[in-house]
C-alpha cells in the first residue's frame, strides 16, 4: 500500500509530465501556425527555413521564456507577500520598465534601435527594484512593502499617461502598441534578452526550500531560521530583472502571473518544488496558445497579445477577487 507521501509525489510527477507535453504541443503549434501552415515535414525546405527557423522560432522562444518568467514571478510574489492576488505588475516594476521604454522612445524620437529600447526598459525596471530594496532595508513589513510597490506603480502609470498625452502621432502609435503587448518585432537580434532570462529562471526554480518557508508566513519563516531580509531582497531583485527583460521583449502583458500560479495551487500543486517548474511550463504553454490566437484571430492584422491575455484573464481575475472576499 502506497503511503500518502508517495501518492502525492506520483501525482506531482504526472502533473509535470502533462504540463511538459502541453508545452511541447503548444510549441509545435506555434511553429506550424501562421499565415501559411507549415508542417514539421516541410521545415527543411527553403520556405520552412525562412518562415520557421528565421521568423517563427525566435518569436516562439521569446513567448515561451516570457510566459515562464511572468508565471514564476507571480508565484514568487504570491508567496512573498502572502497574497493570492499578487502578480508581477503589483510592485510597479512593469510600469517602471514602461517609463524607461517610453523615455527612450520620446527622447530618441523613435530612432533608437531595439537593443537600446530593451536596455532602457531593463534600466527602468531595475531603478524601481532598487527603490523597493531601499524600502526593504528599512525592515518594513511585507504589507508595507507591498503598498510601497503599489504607490510606485501608480506614479509610473501617471508618468506614462503624461508622456502619451504630449507625444506625437508617430511616437504614440509605437507607445500604444507597446502598452498592449506583442511579439511582432522579435527576431534573433533580441536573443541576448532571451539569454538574460534563462539563468534567473533556472535559479529561482531551484529555490523551493526558502519559497516553501516564505509561504508559511513571516513569523513561521523566522522561526524556521530563514534570513527573511536577505531572501526578500534577493527575490524582489530577481523578480524585477525577469519582469524588466519581459517588458523589454514584449511590452506589458497581464494576468499570466496572476492566473497560472493560482490555478496550479487549486489543482493541488502547493509544494514549490513542483509549483515553480509547473508555473514555468504552464505559463509558457498559456502564452504560446495566446500568441497563436493573436496571430490567427484576424486575417489582415495581428492582435496585441496583451489584449488576448486580458480578455481571457479578466473573468478569472474577477472570480479570484470574489473568492478572496468571502
Swiss-Prot record:
Molecular functions (GO terms): vitamin transmembrane transporter activity
Regions that span the bilayer: 15-35, 61-81, 88-108, 112-132, 146-166, 184-204, 240-260, 274-294, 302-322
Compartments, record wording: Cell inner membrane
GO cellular component: plasma membrane
Topological relation to the membrane, as annotated: Multi-pass membrane protein
Keyword Transport: yes
Gene Ontology BP annotations: cobalamin transport
Key word Cell inner membrane present: yes
Keywords, ordered alphabetically: Cell inner membrane, Cell membrane, Membrane, Transmembrane, Transmembrane helix, Transport
SUPFAM superfamilies cross-referenced by the UniProt entry: ABC transporter involved in vitamin B12 uptake, BtuC
Complex and partners: The complex is composed of two ATP-binding proteins (BtuD), two transmembrane proteins (BtuC) and a solute-binding protein (BtuF).
Family note: Belongs to the binding-protein-dependent transport system permease family. FecCD subfamily.
Role noted for this protein: Part of the ABC transporter complex BtuCDF involved in vitamin B12 import. Involved in the translocation of the substrate across the membrane.
Protein name: Vitamin B12 import system permease protein BtuC
Species of provenance: Escherichia coli O17:K52:H18 (strain UMN026 / ExPEC)
